[in-house]
């Protein structure tokens, strides 16, 4: 049995995937897991691999979906992306991290797609820190 929180999250991910497809993204994988790491949606647009985090909240919630993309969460996303790139042997591909915020109001929802949702340099501590090993 799926609890209400998981059902809400699944509905948000379904809506986000549909939005991405409508805007020309090709879905490669959903809910990709490696150990304790997970990527909600992996897709591509043009030559770029896009790792998409989906955050779903009820409209009456006290926090916005963007508040859930903490520094720690960004690090986990980067680790998961590294694992996927290694598994797919796709280190030569351009990559970015997007965020799709889903706010549910009853049976309807509002979606916001944030491209390049966070700065890798800031997340990885500044300087010339490359997250891809080349």
From Swiss-Prot:
Alphabetized SUPFAM superfamilies for the sequence: Restriction endonuclease-like (SSF52980)
Domain of life: Bacteria
GO molecular function: nucleic acid binding
Pfam families: UPF0102 (PF02021)
Listed NCBIfam families: PRK12497.1-3 (NF009150), PRK12497.3-3 (NF009154), PRK14680.1 (NF011273), YraN family protein (TIGR00252)
The family this protein is said to belong to: Belongs to the UPF0102 family.
Name of protein: UPF0102 protein DVU_0833
Organism expressing this protein natively: Nitratidesulfovibrio vulgaris (strain ATCC 29579 / DSM 644 / CCUG 34227 / NCIMB 8303 / VKM B-1760 / Hildenborough)
């Amino acid at each position: 049995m799926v609890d209400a929180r998981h059902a809400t999250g699944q509905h948000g991910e379904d809506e986000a995937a549909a939005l991405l497809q409508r805007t020309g993204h090709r879905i490669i994988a959903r809910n990709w897991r490696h150990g304790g790491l997970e990527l909600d949606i992996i897709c591509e647009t043009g030559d770029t691999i896009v790792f998409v985090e989906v955050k779903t909240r009820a409209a009456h919630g006290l926090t916005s979906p963007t508040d859930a993309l903490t520094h720690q969460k960004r690090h986990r996303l980067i680790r998961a992306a590294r694992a996927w790139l290694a598994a797919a042997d796709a280190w030569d591909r351009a990559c970015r991290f997007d965020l799709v915020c889903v706010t549910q109001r009853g049976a309807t929802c509002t979606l916001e797609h944030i491209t390049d949702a966070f700065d890798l340099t800031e997340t990885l501590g500044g300087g010339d820190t490359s997250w891809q090993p080349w």
